[in-house]
């Protein structure tokens, strides 16, 4: 029995060595034909963690789970008309430029407002803009920009406005069944590899349509076929909720709207999380407003009655005054923003955070020691 077991082990080892040699030969041939790195073991990759870029909204970064939009991936932003889709995308453009990157905007709808984009923080002098004549032209331009490797973000607004050239050349009323879907399917096949290789973020804004004859379930769908749904790593559903009333002289006016952004698909973090943001008309997402709400919910900003305070110092009575204080003190805004991101695990702890935590622990130990000394003194007095 022992001899049989030993023989079996020798045969297994022999076949194992032969398979390993065959694999090594195959890898060498692949590397020779297609270049180094064509096939590699996953653990050999220099960067295994997904790189992200902030969306420009703290609440959305938290909902995305990874801290922002993943680099080298396709993002789809869709929703009803005037829900804030382009606003969300423009904040990503502004954030890209803020981090020193280059952004491009493919305006297929021919409706980009430069003044509004500038109000959101976009440097319109540095923004690459294209207003294509057809869907093929717009996607071809996007592809060339991505292939260059010099562009960090490409926004296409919108998929529904990418009209195939055959439809433009034809007459109104002509049937072009599946033409746009085939165009998008081909574009996704060509662009996906280049997007991943160059680590470019590609954001596609999309509209909503309704399926005809749907009695049960959700009749809503997005145009352009199913290819974009499959290739997108993140899909965001943007919906406007309640209107926001102004204060003071504007108390009877609508100055913005509360918007819900739902992550309906996420390949880099758990999906189905929601972000609630305030989109102010003419200003975009209120970054101070979302910071005050989130920081007060987790206790970084303390709230007592109508007063908000930070580190024992009052920063405003009412949320509007607290938002104004943070807007006037960008260094305090950045400090609180960093603490919130650390709390949700979106950024790694730095030395200052570690020192601060250590000081808090030391204080707690000292307080406990004082209490123990007082208890011992009280006991001695009672015994005497």
Swiss-Prot record:
Gene Ontology molecular functions: ATP binding; ATP hydrolysis activity; ATP-dependent DNA damage sensor activity; damaged DNA binding; single-stranded DNA binding
One GO CC term on file: cytosol
Record flagged with keyword Hydrolase: no
GO BP: any one term: SOS response
Keywords: ATP-binding, Cytoplasm, DNA damage, DNA recombination, DNA repair, DNA-binding, Nucleotide-binding, SOS response
SUPFAM superfamilies per the UniProt record, alphabetical: P-loop containing nucleoside triphosphate hydrolases, RecA protein, C-terminal domain
Chief localisation class: cytoplasm
Domain of life: Bacteria
Compartments in which it is found: Cytoplasm
InterPro entries: AAA+_ATPase, DNA_recomb/repair_RecA, DNA_recomb/repair_RecA_CS, P-loop_NTPase, RecA-like_C, RecA-like_N, RecA_ATP-bd, RecA_C_sf
Keyword Transcription regulation listed: no
Annotated positions binding ATP: 79-86
A Pfam family: RecA
SMART domains (alphabetical): AAA
Main function: Can catalyze the hydrolysis of ATP in the presence of single-stranded DNA, the ATP-dependent uptake of single-stranded DNA by duplex DNA, and the ATP-dependent hybridization of homologous single-stranded DNAs. It interacts with LexA causing its activation and leading to its autocatalytic cleavage.
Family statement: Belongs to the RecA family.
Protein name as it appears in the record: Protein RecA
Organism the protein comes from: Streptococcus thermophilus (strain ATCC BAA-250 / LMG 18311)
């Amino acid at each position: 029995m022992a001899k049989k077991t030993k023989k079996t082990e020798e045969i297994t080892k022999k076949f194992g060595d032969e398979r390993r040699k065959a694999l090594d030969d195959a890898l060498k041939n692949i590397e020779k034909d297609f270049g180094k790195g064509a096939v590699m073991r996953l653990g050999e990759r220099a960067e295994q963690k997904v790189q992200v870029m902030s969306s420009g909204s703290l609440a959305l970064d938290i909902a995305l789970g990874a801290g922002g939009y993943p680099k080298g991936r396709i993002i789809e932003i869709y929703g009803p008309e005037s829900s804030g889709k382009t606003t969300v995308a423009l904040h990503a453009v502004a954030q890209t430029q803020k981090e020193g990157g280059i952004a491009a905007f493919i305006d297929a709808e021919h409706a980009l407002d430069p003044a509004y984009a500038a109000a959101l923080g976009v440097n319109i002098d540095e923004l690459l803009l294209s207003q294509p004549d057809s869907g093929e032209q717009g996607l071809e331009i996007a592809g060339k920009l991505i292939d260059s490797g010099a562009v960090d973000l490409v926004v296409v607004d919108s998929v529904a406005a990418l009209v195939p050239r055959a439809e433009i050349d034809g007459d109104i009323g002509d049937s072009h069944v599946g033409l746009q879907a085939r165009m998008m399917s081909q574009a996704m096949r060509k662009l996906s590899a280049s997007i991943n290789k160059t680590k470019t973020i590609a954001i596609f804004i999309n509209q909503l349509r309704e399926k005809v004859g749907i009695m049960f379930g959700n009749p809503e769908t997005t145009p352009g076929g199913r290819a974009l749904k499959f290739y997108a790593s993140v899909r965001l559903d943007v919906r406007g909720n309640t209107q926001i009333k102004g204060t003071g002289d504007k108390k009877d006016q609508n100055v913005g709207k509360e918007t819900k952004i739902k992550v309906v698909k996420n390949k880099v973090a758990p999906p189905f999380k929601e972000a609630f943001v305030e989109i102010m008309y003419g200003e975009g997402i209120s970054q101070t407003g979302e910071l005050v709400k989130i920081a007060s919910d987790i206790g970084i900003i303390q709230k007592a009655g109508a007063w908000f305070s930070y580190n024992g110092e009052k920063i405003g009575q009412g949320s509007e005054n607290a938002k104004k204080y943070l807007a006037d003190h960008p260094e305090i805004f950045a400090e609180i923003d960093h603490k919130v991101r650390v709390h949700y695990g979106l950024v790694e702890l730095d030395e200052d955070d570690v020192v601060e935590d250590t000081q808090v622990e030391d204080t707690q130990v000292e307080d406990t020691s004082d209490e123990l000394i007082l208890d011992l003194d009280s006991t001695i007095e009672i015994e005497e």
